[in-house]
Amino acid sequence: MDYYFTKGKPQLVNMKTPIYLVTQFQQLMDLMQNQYEVSCLELMQRSGKAACDFLVYRWPKVKKISIFCGRGDNGGQGYVLAQQAKKMGMVPTVWQVGHQMSMSKPPQMHKEVWYEMNSCHQQGIVLHTYSPDIDLGDPELIVDALFGVGLYGHVRPEIALLLQRLQQFTVPILAIEVPTGINASTGEIAGNALAATATITFLCMKLGLLINDGKIYSGEIAFDDLLAPEAIYQQVKGIEESSLLDSSTIFSKKIWYRNKTQKGWQLSIN
C-alpha cells in the first residue's frame, strides 16, 4: 500500500510507498544488489535520472542548474543528474565538495562515483572544486547531492558554512535522498541543515523526511521506487501502519509518486 498524507494523517492508496529507517533502507539496497542483481552503478544511474526527470517536471523552465556533489554515492547521483540535464538541454555546473576531478580513483571514493565524475568530464560538463571564496554565479536552481543518507554525526564546520551560503539564494533547492544535515531516520538536524524546496527519495520513503525538523526541511517530497520488485518490501518490513496512524508527528505534505507502473508523476494534494 501507499500513503498520501492528508490533514496530518496517512491515507492508504493503491501504490506501495513503504516507510523505513535508514538501516532498513540499507537492507533493501543490499537485496537489490545481491538477490536481484541490480548493480550499485545501475541504482545510482536510475536514481540520478529519476531526479532529473522530476526536476524537469517540477521546474520545466529552468535552464541553469548548480549541482553540489559530495564524494560519496549521493554525489554520484548528482553526477548522473548533471549528465542527464545536459542531454535535456540544460546547462549544469557541478561543484565538487571535499574532492576534485582526478584521472585515477581517490582511495576513499567508490568506483561508481569516480566513473560518473569522469563521465561528466568527458561530456564537457564544467566541474569546479568548491572553496568558500569562489563565486557561485547565478543558478536558477540548486541541487543538494552532498550526503544523502550517508551523513553520520554533525555537519562539519566548513559544510555548515556552505549550507548557510546556499540558503541565501532565492532559487529552488532540490535535495537528493535527504536534505544535507537531516537525519534520515529521526528527522533531527545534525548541527546545521539545508532547507529544500523539494526532496526526491528512492526505493522507500525515509521516516526522517516526515517527522521533526525533517518534515519542514524536506519541502515537497518526490518518491521513485527505482523499478524495485514488490517482493522486496515483504522481505524487509518497514514501519508498522499502526505506529504511523497513532503518531501525532506526521506532517501534512505534498508528495509526488512514481513507480514502475506509472509513466509520470502523481501528486497527492493535501
UniProtKB/Swiss-Prot annotation:
Q: Which terms does the record give in the GO molecular function aspect?
A: metal ion binding; NAD(P)HX epimerase activity; nucleotide binding
Superkingdom of this protein's organism:
Bacteria
Kindly list the positions annotated as binding (6S)-NADPHX. Answer: 73-77, 148-154, 177
The reactions it catalyses are: (6R)-NADHX = (6S)-NADHX; (6R)-NADPHX = (6S)-NADPHX
Q: EC no.? A: 5.1.99.6
**Where in this chain does the record put each YjeF N-terminal domain?**
25-234
Q: Which family does it belong to?
A: Belongs to the NnrE/AIBP family.
User: What is the designated name of this protein?
Assistant: NAD(P)H-hydrate epimerase
Q: Which organism is it from?
A: Legionella pneumophila (strain Corby)
- What is the phylogenetic placement of the source species in the record? Bacteria, Pseudomonadati, Pseudomonadota, Gammaproteobacteria, Legionellales
